[in-house]
Curated annotation (Swiss-Prot):
GO BP: any one term: ribosomal small subunit assembly
Domain annotation KH type-2: ranges: 206-285
All copies of domain Era-type G, residue ranges: 5-175
Protein known as: GTPase Era
Keyword annotations of the record: Cell wall, GTP-binding, Nucleotide-binding, RNA-binding, Secreted
UniProt keyword rRNA-binding present: no
Compartment(s) of residence: Cell envelope; Secreted, Cell wall
Subunit: Monomer.
Organism the protein comes from: Mycobacterium sp. (strain KMS)
Database matches in PROSITE patterns: G_ERA, KH_TYPE_2
Ranges for region G1: 13-20
Amino acid sequence: MSEFRSGFVCFVGRPNTGKSTLTNALVGTKVAITSNRPQTTRHTIRGIVHRDEFQIILVDTPGLHRPRTLLGQRLNDLVKTTYSEVDVIGLCIPADEAIGPGDRWIHEQIRAVAPRTTLVVIVTKIDKVPRDRVAAQLMAVSELVGPDAEIVPVSATTGEQLDVLTDVLAGKLPPGPAFYPDGELTDEPEETLMAELIREAALEGVRDELPHSLAVVIDEVSPREDRDDLIDVHAILYVERDSQKGIVIGKGGARLREVGTAARLQIEKLLGTKVYLDLRVKIAKNWQRDPKQLGRLGF
């Protein structure tokens, strides 16, 4: 690769196939929310991979799925728009699950929406299964996508094959100048990242009905008047029902305090300063199905 290359790559796949973890591993810092709950990525976050010979801008999309709510439909539209605007699509299929109808549907969607975009298939989570299972999955993936797509097995957790994947992706980008200055790792505003970190902490270890019903809005960020080493962050967690409010707050407010502590530590890392984090929980009835409320909450 003699001339500098730069371009956009998006990872797609069923929910929970390791797309956000992969983004964070390639960038080398946390820019995408990771959670073992499916469908937790809501915005297309661009993580940026800098090397001397190339720059890869990673667009992290929500998992593509058959939508059940207006929010689900908007997330799917966002994914499809992204498909047609990038240089390379990385289809993520985990090594530890058999290929199913969801994977086939997504492959069909990619070929229908972006037939000319370069496709690389990434077999994720290879650390979770023995070598023979990885080999069998590579064969199955090859049957699914045919001879045109390159297939790369990786583990974002252990780092195995990440350098190979980076080189494969970079090799498929067009020649061109860097889009972002060296050292910049994401173009997401800090407030969006803070909201995502709070959302991630709130989703940790809760029941299945909550992820889709939880939205976080940063209400105010301001330096503390009498202290230049402290920033006050006020955030509101919106849920759809009273019962969900109870889940988020927990007995005597214990769960909300845990969420606050976990999120505050991550936000302090992000901002590089001490943070006072104030969290409130409010109900926005059925916000996922209401266009006005979706707009107000940033979708």
